[in-house]
């Protein structure tokens, strides 16, 4: 409720007489109003307004004489009654509740609701219940009901503090509103009419007529929203007049900018102020300055809220304002927003741009679009991906991508060809952002996105880097963006561009090209020197290459590529698709917060179940023949291709009862057991029955490839297992057994013979395989080879230990010279020192290489 203090009247009495009258009036007032609560406040003279008929009119009016004006020229004291102070406190609490509702901060709402109920008790002691309180509790109850409905339709849960506050408010609001049910019904029936009427004020009870020496008549003061003939105007905090004129725009903006980062700053009020300034802005410069400050203020709302991401409504408003800002800049080329420009200091006048000149405005268009991108990513991280809300939020990416392309076109017009130019760096950043939005998408999706983007852009906008005419060629688009970054950037941007291109090629089944680019980039050698986000992108690219190799039927390459990520058991963490919380983890809360910020949105995830299935299937094709080979060749037992697969297979074999396969992992293990037993048909049937293959492109082609691989590996397993029991075997028999062409069988056997995996020869005359006998080691020979291997391992370990202990001691074991000089042991006599025999003359022989430690008697026996 607005309260104004009017100055009125001009008395002809002297100042001394006036003072006496005031003092006498105050004494009489104290005598007649000791029982009243308002008399405790230091009120001005004897006036007491009887009935205020206008609800918005001020209740406290002060007559000031000319003498008082002369005394109060330097200081104006605003006197408020206790009731007005309580109403001010009530309005402050209500405003805090409204702000907390905008950001869904139920912890703040709960605490402020308690304060509100305590304050309303004090307010109602001196008058009726304020209508603003009825409005607040009614709207709060509606907001609680809306939140309950949203929680039922969404799987996303509140955090602990929010849920606690929400439950507390939900329980207390219904009980509280029962006391004001009648007033709340009136408010909901006609909200505007209810709030338009003033609060009914009780008439003050006058105990006795007041006697004063001078009777004063006060005229009612009308409160208006705009300036009138009496000099009244809308006032803000501190009694300052708020005037929004084109000339005062820069002053208002400077006040807003200077208040950034300070506590107790009402950013919503600042946003409303700038929206009003936009209405009175007259030239492009004013609109550009307002939009730059307005967008920054909307971003600041995130830092002051409990949520760590921008609300959807504020994000959309910021995105629309950013798009409007680009339109203003595109229409007025004489104004350029660039980093490092000098700020206009004179707020009294506007800068004038002569014809042909350019005015640089400080700011960063690229930083704004990057922040919009980051806020969208944070929002997608927080939303449950299995709800319609996620899909709806993801649709905002189209508008963001349009602004990215638009920003790129704007940056191209400002960029020079020098790498060191800050404008070139800005262009590189926005191109990198655009590339990161398309590298993981299929070509069909990117084509639709590009076509929609260029249709929504003005026809006069054109890009030299990515022309409008080539928007349909997705492969060419990615290649063009990457090549531009290769030429004009270095460091992290160049590495990320390379990884994005490799990922895109692997996603579209170009295995050999993506593999060659990865090898030529040498990123595998120095990826540890890059930041964590680039390492995550490297892991994603590596996994995509492995998946591409598997789709191409290159099982060995797929297993070898995927082993680094899948063999660690930390796929979620390495691919930034989840956090593995361990019981005794030493990760600090700050590290955990950073780890959560690095998580990728759900639509960018690689299916971990499919990834594990492909890795286990590839390991099965390599491990099962290897296990069959080592059963007859003990010297091969040390070879383990996949420890993960071996561990799962051993665990399954230890089970007393084995039921049917219940998940993808069990299906692969059961298929491996059938393959090891020689039943390749059941193995193929079990493997093809896994439903996850339907998630891959062309699933029938994948299943056909798997069946062929099982036939080939089944043949290899059969030969490794039963070779000791055959003298010869017909190729036609093997062809009928595994349903493979004879030429294919001959090729497989020839490869096994050339790799020395099979001791046999091809008899082309009889079309058969002849096995050689006596090549396999006997049991005793196998034990001797094992003992020799262990001894060599012990020798190598001893030499490494000696190297560590003798670093910087080159002559530590050259005892011949020192011992001879001291006349000690071994000097002048042909004794033997520890570690081996001495040569004639008392000098110990030194063998070339190593640290000259032979391993003692055992080492000598082995080397002999």
From Swiss-Prot:
Region span, Disordered: 1-77, 815-864
Pfam families for this protein: eIF-3c_N, PCI
UniProt entry tagged with the keyword Heme: no
MF terms (GO), sorted A to Z: RNA binding; translation initiation factor activity; translation initiation factor binding
Residue ranges occupied by any PCI domain in the UniProt entry: 602-776
Source domain of life: Eukaryota
Compartments, as annotated in UniProt: Cytoplasm
One GO cellular component term: eukaryotic translation initiation factor 3 complex, eIF3m
One record GO biological process: formation of cytoplasmic translation initiation complex
Compositionally biased tracts (Gly residues): 820-864
InterPro entries: EIF3C (IPR027516), EIF3C_N_dom (IPR008905), PCI_dom (IPR000717), WH-like_DNA-bd_sf (IPR036388), WH_DNA-bd_sf (IPR036390)
Ranges of compositional bias, category Acidic residues: 14-54
Assembly and binders: Component of the eukaryotic translation initiation factor 3 (eIF-3) complex.
Function text: Component of the eukaryotic translation initiation factor 3 (eIF-3) complex, which is involved in protein synthesis of a specialized repertoire of mRNAs and, together with other initiation factors, stimulates binding of mRNA and methionyl-tRNAi to the 40S ribosome. The eIF-3 complex specifically targets and initiates translation of a subset of mRNAs involved in cell proliferation.
HAMAP family linked: eIF3c (MF_03002)
PANTHER family according to UniProt: EUKARYOTIC TRANSLATION INITATION FACTOR 3, SUBUNIT 8 EIF3S8 -RELATED, EUKARYOTIC TRANSLATION INITIATION FACTOR 3 SUBUNIT C-RELATED
Similarity-based family: Belongs to the eIF-3 subunit C family.
Protein name per Swiss-Prot or TrEMBL: Eukaryotic translation initiation factor 3 subunit C
Source organism: Aspergillus terreus (strain NIH 2624 / FGSC A1156)
Gene designation per UniProt: nip1
